Amino acid sequence: MKLAVIGGDGIGPEVTAEALKVLDAVLPGVDKTEYDLGARRYHATGELLPDSVIDELRAHDAILLGAIGDPSVPSGVLERGLLLRLRFELDHHINLRPGRLYPGVSSPLAGNPDIDFVVVREGTEGPYTGTGGAIRVGTPNEVATEVSQNTAFGVRRVVVDAFERARRRRKHLTLVHKTNVLTFAGKLWSRIVAEVGRDYPDVEVAYQHIDAATIFMVTDPGRFDVIVTDNLFGDIITDLSAAVCGGIGLAASGNIDGTRTNPSMFEPVHGSAPDIAGQGVADPTAAIMSVALLLAHLGEDAAATRVDRAVERYLATRGNERPATTEVGERIAAAL
């Protein structure tokens, strides 16, 4: 396996180091190449993501990312120039966010054993394509537009992926949208879900408006198995799912090219937390859980299961203790 590693900013390098410690314990011999991308490189060279680096990344089987973001860089520069460019250049059209409440984890819904779902979010369309603009800026008559792009091709490929995952899980899929207001995109999503669903007669299909889905995710999260949704709604509902499952610090994600033409990228969804960087207190659990997603994506199912079970054992016994960053990695690696 050839793995590209982007530690990034803030606590990113710290949590990534512990994730690699666990990866080495469960699957020794991975060929790793580290890339210096983020605020430090931007300040030193003015570069965000050179074309040459993109070409190098394409030669890897997967990418492990720590975190990107620094207050010394204007808002949006790193996000669009690095994170979103990676997503679009490598065609990461599937954003995968598992939501599971592990035993022993503190949550508003702690003790509910039925919280185990996955959100399949479209990753390269919607309002994040940068289409839109503004006129009469700074005047009382300013007009700003953000265009949400939804293509049949883009919707279909993420819907097919969601149905495949539902078939392997509990055979239930929920489309989350706002079809009563966003009628054009809503009809496209609804029609394609219905069309694809005919090829999966064993998968039960449901629909929820995004506002209703947020209510049910809190009051009855056990109803969800696989959720498929667009880029914007997925961005919102996955953070709610993280809160339901114990917080953003336990949220792993995968940015996936379903065609496997390009390497997929796996990362914890928490930010770079520059205020605690270098203190050794950042929780690397989400980064370690991202390694489990990475392994599963590359067909290393046994290794992925071992990591997931080691994390589960660690969380079940941790209680209110908050070990140092390196200690978390050492405990989980030792359990392997």
Swiss-Prot record:
Write down the PROSITE patterns for this protein, in alphabetical order. Answer: IDH_IMDH (PS00470)
The pathway to which it is assigned is:
Amino-acid biosynthesis; L-leucine biosynthesis; L-leucine from 3-methyl-2-oxobutanoate: step 3/4
What does the entry list as the binding residues for substrate?
87, 97, 121, 211
GO biological process annotations for this chain's record? L-leucine biosynthetic process
Residues that coordinate or bind Mg(2+): 211, 235, 239
Q: What is its main location?
A: cytoplasm
**Where found, per UniProt?**
Cytoplasm
Q: Which Pfam families match?
A: Iso_dh
What broad class of enzyme is this?
A: oxidoreductase
What PANTHER family does UniProt report for this protein, alphabetically? D-MALATE DEHYDROGENASE [DECARBOXYLATING] (PTHR43275:SF1)
The record's note on quaternary structure and interaction partners says: Homodimer.
What family does this chain come from, according to its entry? Answer: Belongs to the isocitrate and isopropylmalate dehydrogenases family. LeuB type 2 subfamily.
What is this protein's name?
A: 3-isopropylmalate dehydrogenase
